[in-house]
From Swiss-Prot:
Organismal lineage: Eukaryota, Fungi, Dikarya, Ascomycota, Taphrinomycotina
Cellular compartments annotated: Cytoplasm
Modified residues (Phosphoserine): 195
Protein species of origin: Schizosaccharomyces pombe (strain 972 / ATCC 24843)
Protein name per the record: Probable inositol polyphosphate 5-phosphatase C9G1.10c
Family: Belongs to the inositol 1,4,5-trisphosphate 5-phosphatase family.
Location of region: Disordered: 1-193, 205-281, 294-334, 355-425
Broad class of where this protein is predominantly found: cytoplasm
GO molecular function: phosphatidylinositol-4,5-bisphosphate 5-phosphatase activity
Keywords tagged on the record: Cytoplasm, Hydrolase, Phosphoprotein
Regions of compositional bias (Low complexity) in chain numbering: 414-425
Length: 1191
């Protein structure tokens, strides 16, 4: 068959042709003005079909369906050059009128004149070519291409339907006929479809040989019904367009094409279509020819509007091969893959079920909660293998001679929370899926700076990566590399790199010479170059192109260097006998997963690579013919968790691998068992940029510029420190952490380096200041004297009540004296009221806002509001005087904000011990502009113990929980208090490394007021539980308790609340014992709360109760706080300080010895005990110990 070609002008030297051919030639020349789309040399060119919009080749009627590419055939018929064509157009037309002519060979005519009503076709008169299609082309002559001829007659005899389209010139309609079924000689049945196009355009596909069958489904056929045909005679289509007379108006069939599948199925996979394009044919002629033939074939009846076809059911055979997976696709992409894919192992059509069936849902996971419970991170649990959630795949056993690891199943599937059968099971499931929350009660906020040496370095070029070794820091990035001294901060060398962009960097291992440790640096670039630089002598050693993509990681493993590029190619560089460890040597390579977001080599010589939140493990010791993957499938953490952004290991926990995530979580995996162990929800929900392990601590840097230090040796984790390490821009701060453990004996300090926005800072990895402060505070009883101080807290939302309302109420008249007597006449009495003025009076609150800006009217408005506070102060003073006959209580401080009022009384004997008294206010209403919501903060010291009392009123509303949380954060962070400048006084009186400028710096904090946290349940259920006095059940829905349990960032998590044993205090009808009966019918809630914070050894609470005062819609509450105030003895403190310093030196020396032992182990591959013996025998001199081991 001749190849389809583009139309062009005929050469002038072309021989004269018969009139019939010249007539066809003129028809084709009229088509040469249309646009042709040239695909390639072997792809057919397609003309723009008339009637399409915007010049596209897709008909309007089929606009919603994609048109498949032309069917490519494996062979072509020679061109018409040299063939004899005789007869006239009229004779050819008469041949088509005769239905008995079985030798009607046709050519394609792409366009017909609109004013012609006759069909101009051509048929060969020679019987020698009756079984071949003839393409008459006006193109230049080309060499004749011979190929197997396709018998049109034999193909027609084996069909059971048609796959043609008739074009009506009058109405310009398309009429899709039924499609034929072609059967091959091999006994296979395969459908061949022709996509219907407007203006009579068809795509013909045929087999390359008579012994092979071609089975290709178009994208349209994938969406249609597939009906199995039987051996019986098919039914007749009453609306068959071919039963109409040419030239008459034919009804348009709206039915989609129907594909008939024979009773025989393919037993062998269909062959891949040949890349050769199909030949052009005269479309209208072939339509008429097939219309005649269709009258001799059994006809098929199809409904005009069939129902929407169901989804195809495909074979569910599982396969790991991408070639076999093509057979499982049920969408239109299967057809494209069969037409264009070079794969040859495609599942045969007989494996594909064509019976419409409703798709089944996947089964639910069958694992239980006990399998998902988080184990404790102990050596006993880590030594035993866990039971997988699902049956593991067969392990991939490697050669026993090489002693390589075996593929391990991974038990990390997500669990279904519905498996929880009880509240305790649900709680355990929350821990597994949502993560446990660290203890933040002892967090310190001061940065761990060094006493001596430089603290930071500002870099004036775009530094992207760094590495540190001893006292040498190397920075690299876009266009340069610099070497700094970490102690002095001086720049020793700057090497310009021009347009070179460094993407990875690491110090080279120096196994052949200990003195070269920290001398040479390897770094990879974006263009795949690997450089070696001598940073001590300031020159380039060598460089080599090892990849055509960026080298993303350069890693060190003992005496080896590992490089990983972006396409997943890992190179392992080992020491050579001639060149040593050099870039110019030949590395061993393996293939890993490309585009790794994190990679690190562990001490068991395995590479852990992360893509997204999937973890892959590779063994580089495998041969090139063997798969390097250790796991049958990657590990992933369970639950809804973000992608992995960083990872690290901790030397004191040899079996644990820690990964940080973009949502602030930290996941833990077992290095030996290849399974997920635990999920930690840190106190920040921002992206973790970097992780570093130091001793028993894990350092985490966040995109906010904050750096957290966790103690992972305890369960739950303890947050030891949090400070603002770097400034964050509007895009965040990408903070990178780095550490050289050997710097503890090389540079005489363990330095953790952080870099963000071209600023490098150095932190004390041992945190000496925090260690000393914590040890000294734990020894307070050794050098301090303690006295008991009791504090009574009374909180009430007065609802704009007046002091006279207390006298009119039965309980109110005796409430304050009864409260003082029942709590044993405490040393300090604090009254905290809310809503002393009507906050719903918009006019009054507006005057209070403008009172400070208006000098004239503001004074009178302020006086009107202040009169309320003055009346309440006088009332409280009179009540306290009535309680104590000898004037025991005096007013310490009285402060007010719009609606808020705090009044503190102390006993006379305690007043002389109080110092550093200060009060301040924090506004949270209207974005901090209005004091209708906010807090009053009172701070004072009793001897050497600091107290802070906070009276607050938070945002109201059942659904405004987030606003209340934000108000708490604003109050605790923005209260402006005077700091303490003396470092000794800071250590003695404040906690967390603070100086007293924040609320959380104080040793005893009490927060009370109308916190407005509600109960998340329905009103009838709440009332029923209150009636039954089932307080514990109702407390399970309390918003404050739920936030403290589940929200890692909740600011009251470090506070303690006494046990609630009374009914909700809100909302009552005024002067009534009935809960809210208004239209809103609010759910009762414990809005009035008292919480405290402090060391359990020095603070406790009791008598947490409510009072039945009906003057407001709230009930007042009170609690008695017991605390111990200390008086530090300076002389005893000095003696204790000397003891603590000696203990610190022992701790630092022990850490230094362990670092040296680990260093010798890595260089010599000896055991821990052997390395310790060599070092102790050489007075812990590393260089002498290495020489002794090598000798």
């Amino acid at each position: 068959m001749a190849s389809r070609q583009g139309f062009s002008n005929v050469n002038e030297d072309e021989p004269e042709l018969p009139p019939s051919v010249l007539s066809l030639k003129s028809k084709f020349e009229s088509l040469s003005t249309g646009d042709l789309t040239n695909l390639d040399e072997k792809t057919a060119k397609r003309r723009t079909v008339k009637g399409c919009k915007n010049g596209t080749s897709e008909p309007n009627v089929f606009k919603a369906r994609p048109i498949p590419p032309p069917r490519q055939v494996s062979s072509t018929i020679g061109s018409s050059t040299g063939r004899k064509v005789s007869g006239s157009i009229q004779r050819l037309a008469s041949n088509f009128k005769n239905p008995s002519n079985p030798h009607a060979d046709v050519s394609k005519i792409d366009r017909l004149p609109s004013d012609s009503s006759e069909s101009h076709v051509a048929t060969p008169s020679s019987p020698t070519i009756s079984n071949s299609f003839v393409s008459v082309s006006p193109l230049l002559k080309r060499p004749q291409q011979k190929g197997p001829e396709i018998s049109f007659q034999s193909s027609v005899q084996s069909t059971k339907g048609n796959d043609l389209m008739k074009h009506d010139d009058t109405n310009n309609h398309q009429i899709p006929p039924p499609k034929p079924n072609f059967s091959s000689k091999a006994g296979s049945s395969s459908p061949i479809s022709v996509s219907p196009l407007k203006n009579v355009k068809a795509y013909i596909s045929q087999s390359p040989t008579h012994s092979e069958a071609s089975s290709v489904l178009s994208s349209e056929e994938e969406e249609e019904n597939v009906i199995n045909s039987s051996k019986s005679v098919p039914s007749f289509d009453l609306h068959d367009p071919f039963s109409q007379t040419f030239g008459k108006e034919c009804p348009i069939s709206t039915a989609p094409p129907v594909l008939n599948i024979g009773d025989r199925s393919l037993e062998t996979p269909p062959p891949i279509p040949s890349p050769r394009p199909p030949q052009p044919v005269a479309v209208e002629a072939i339509q008429q020819s097939r219309a005649v033939i269709s009258q001799q074939l059994p006809l098929h009846v199809s409904p005009r509007k069939p129902p929407k076809p169901p989804l195809r059911k495909v074979s569910t055979q599982r396969s790991s091969s991408p070639i076999e997976n093509l057979a499982t696709k049920s969408d239109a992409s299967l057809v494209t893959g069969l037409q264009s894919s070079p794969y040859t192992h495609i599942a045969p059509a007989s494996e594909m079920s064509l019976i419409p069936e409703k798709p089944r849902l996947p089964p639910r996971p069958s694992h239980t909660l006990s399998e998902l419970s988080s184990p404790a991170l102990t050596s006993e649990n880590l030594s035993s293998k866990p039971s997988p959630l699902f049956p593991p795949p067969p392990p991939r056993v490697k050669s026993l001679a090489t002693n390589k690891p075996v593929s391990m199943p991974v038990s990390t599937e997500q669990s279904d929370p519905s498996v929880a059968a009880s509240s305790s099971s649900s709680s355990q499931l929350d821990v597994v899926l949502k993560g446990s929350i660290p203890d933040t009660s002892s967090v310190r906020r001061n940065p761990p700076c060094f006493v001596n040496g430089v603290e930071s370095i500002n870099v004036d070029f775009e530094a992207r990566i760094f590495d540190v070794s001893g006292d040498r820091l190397v920075l690299a990035g876009n266009g340069g590399l610099r070497v700094y001294d970490t102690v002095t901060g001086l720049c020793h060398w700057h090497m310009p790199l021009g347009d070179t962009k460094v993407t990875s960097l690491s110090f080279k291992s120096s196994p052949e010479n200990y003195s070269d440790d920290g001398r040479f640096v390897w770094f990879g670039t974006r263009d795949g170059m690997l450089w070696e630089v001598d940073v001590q002598n300031h020159h380039i050693v060598t460089k080599k192109s090892v990849s055509n993509c960026p080298i993303t990681y350069v890693m060190v493993y003992k005496n080896e260097m590992w490089t990983l590029d972006d396409m997943g190619k890992l190179y392992v560089w080992q020491e050579d006998e001639i060149m040593g460890l050099s870039i110019q040597s030949t590395p061993h390579s393996i293939r890993t997963i490309p585009h790794a977001t994190h990679a690190m080599v562990l001490d068991n010589r395995l590479l852990w690579v992360v893509v997204g939140k999937s973890i892959y493990v590779y063994d580089p010791s495998t041969s090139e013919n063997e798969s390097a993957s250790v796991l049958a499938k990657p590990m992933t953490p369970p639950g809804l968790i973000g992608d992995i952004s960083c990872g690290t290991t901790i030397s004191n926990f040899t079996d644990l691998v820690f990964y940080g995530h973009v949502d602030g979580k930290i996941s833990i995996f077992s290095k030996t068992q290849y399974r997920f162990l635990e999920l930690i929800t840190s106190s920040s929900f921002y992206r973790i940029c970097s992780l570093v392990g130091v001793g028993n601590t894990l350092w985490a840097a966040y995109t906010t510029g904050m750096i957290y230090v966790f103690d992972v040796s305890e369960s739950p984790w303890r947050l030891l420190k949090s400070w603002h390490g770097h400034k964050a821009s509007h895009n965040g701060a990408t903070t990178i952490l780095g550490i050289d453990v050997n710097s503890v004996w090389k540079a005489k300090r363990l330095q953790v380096v952080s870099m963000a926005s071209s600023v490098v800072k150095f932190w004390d990895g041992l945190m000496m200041g925090d260690w000393l402060a914590t040890e000294m505070r734990s020894r307070f009883p050794e050098y301090s004297n303690f006295t008991d101080v009791s504090i009574l807290i009374c909180s009430w939302n007065a609802g704009a009540s007046k002091p006279s309302d207390l006298d009119s109420d039965t309980i109110g008249a005796s409430m304050i004296p009864m409260m003082i007597r029942d709590n044993g006449y405490p040393d300090i009495v604090v009254f905290g009221f809310q809503e002393l003025v009507d906050l719903e009076n918009k006019r009054l609150t507006a005057r209070s806002i403008l009172s400070k800006s208006s000098s004239k009217g503001g004074s009178s408005n302020s006086a009107n509001i202040s009169s309320q506070y003055r009346l309440w102060r006088e009332k409280l003073e009179s009540e306290m005087m009535r309680v104590s006959s000898n004037d025991d209580y005096q007013v310490l401080v009285c402060e007010n904000l719009v609606g808020l009022f705090s009044c503190v009384f102390v006993k006379n004997k305690l007043q002389s011990k109080i110092r550093m008294l200060q009060s301040t206010t924090v506004k949270t209403g209207l974005g901090g502009l209005h004091g209708n919501k906010g807090a009053i903060v009172v701070r004072f010291l009793v001897d050497d113990t600091s107290y802070c009392i906070v009276n607050c009123h938070l945002a109201a509303g059942q659904s405004n929980k987030a606003a209340r949380n934000n108000d708490l954060a604003t109050i605790l962070d923005n209260a402006s208090l005077f700091p303490e400048n003396d470092e000794t006084d800071q250590l003695n009186t404040f906690v967390g490394g603070g100086d007293g400028s924040l609320i959380m710096d104080h040793e005893v904090c009490v927060l009370h007021g109308d916190l407005n946290y509600r109960i998340n349940t329905l009103r009838p259920k709440a009332l029923d539980l209150i009636k039954k006095n089932d307080i514990k059940t109702l407390l399970q829905s309390d918003q404050l308790l739920v936030e403290r349990k589940r929200n890692a960032g909740f600011r009251l998590r470090t506070f303690t609340e006494p046990e609630i044993t009374f009914a909700p205090t809100y909302k009552y009808d005024v002067h009534s014992e009935q809960y809210d009966s208004s239209e809103k019918k609010r759910v009762p809630a414990w809005c009035d709360r008292i919480c405290y914070r402090g060391s359990p050894d020095y603070i406790s609470a009791e008598n947490y109760t409510r009072y039945e005062l009906k003057a407001s819609d709230h009930r007042p509450v009170s609690a008695l706080i017991h605390s111990k105030a200390k008086m530090v003895n300076a002389q005893s403190q000095g003696s204790t300080w000397d003891v603590v310093k000696r203990k610190w030196i022992e701790y630092a020396d022990e850490f230094k010895r362990k670092a040296k032992i680990t260093y010798v182990m890595n260089y010599t591959s000896v055991s821990y005990q052997t390395a310790e013996q060599y070092l102790s025998g050489n007075n812990w001199n590393v260089q002498n110990a290495l020489k002794q081991v090598s000798s």
